[in-house]
C-alpha cells in the first residue's frame, strides 16, 4: 500500500487507484519536530522580525507552550524587557527536555508558576504592541533579560545581530512550521553551550 505524508496529514491506502478503496485518514497533527508543536500557530499576522538572543515576532493572538513543560516564571510586569510580560518554562519531555524557554515583551501570561503545561496549553496572549514578542532559550534561573546575555554571548544587549543560541532556537521553531527570520543568514555571534541543540 502507498502512503503519503502531506503537512501533517497521513494517508494510507492505494492513492490514485480506480477501485472502491478510499484513502484512510490515520492522523492529523501540527507537529513536525519530535514531541513539539508550533507555539505561534494561532498568532494572527505573524511576522518573523529577526534573530538576536532569541527570535522576535510581530502579530497578535494566543501563544502555546512548545511541548510538555512546567512554568518557572510568569509575570505581567517587565522582567527587564520592554512591553510587559515575562514567562519561562522548563521542557519536561522531548529531545530538549531539561532546557528552559522564555517568552517576553508584548505578552500577558495566562499561566501560573508550577503549572504543568503541554503543546495544547495557551500560556500567554500576544498583543499588538510596538515591541512584538521575543522567545528563545533561557538560563535555568530565567529571571530577567540580563539572564540571557552571558549565555548568548550577547553583542552589547539588544541589536540586529543573530547569536548562535538564538539561531539554535530559531531552527527548532522552523522545524515545527514557524517561518524563518529574515536575518538568519548573517554571521552569528556568541557561543552555543554544548547542551543546546546544534545549529544545522
Where are these regions (language model features)?
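Local beta-strand/beta-hairpin segments that build beta-sheet-rich folds
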Residues: 123-124
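Short peripheral tails and domain-boundary helices/loops at the edges of structured domains
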Residues: 139-183
Amino acid at each position: 500500500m502507498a502512503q503519503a505524508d502531506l503537512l501533517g496529514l497521513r494517508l494510507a491506502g492505494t492513492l490514485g487507484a480506480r477501485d472502491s478503496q478510499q484513502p484512510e485518514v490515520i492522523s492529523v497533527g501540527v507537529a513536525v519536530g519530535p514531541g513539539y508543536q508550533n507555539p505561534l500557530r494561532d498568532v494572527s499576522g505573524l511576522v518573523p522580525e529577526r534573530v538576536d538572543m532569541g527570535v522576535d515576532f510581530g502579530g497578535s493572538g494566543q501563544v502555546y507552550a512548545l511541548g510538555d513543560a512546567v512554568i518557572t516564571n510568569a509575570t505581567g510586569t517587565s522582567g527587564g524587557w520592554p512591553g510587559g510580560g515575562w514567562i519561562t518554562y522548563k521542557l519536561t519531555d522531548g529531545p530538549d527536555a531539561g532546557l528552559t524557554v522564555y517568552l517576553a515583551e508584548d505578552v500577558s501570561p495566562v499561566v501560573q508558576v508550577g503549572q504543568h503545561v503541554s503543546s495544547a496549553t495557551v500560556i500567554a496572549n500576544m498583543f499588538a504592541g510596538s515591541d512584538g514578542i521575543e522567545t528563545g532559550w533561557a538560563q535555568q534561573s530565567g529571571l530577567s533579560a540580563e539572564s540571557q546575555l552571558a549565555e548568548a554571548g550577547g553583542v552589547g544587549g539588544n541589536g540586529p545581530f543573530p547569536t548562535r543560541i538564538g539561531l539554535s532556537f530559531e531552527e527548532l521553531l522552523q522545524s515545527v512550521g514557524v517561518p524563518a527570520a529574515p536575518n538568519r543568514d548573517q554571521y552569528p555571534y556568541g557561543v552555543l553551550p554544548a547542551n543546546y541543540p546544534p545549529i544545522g
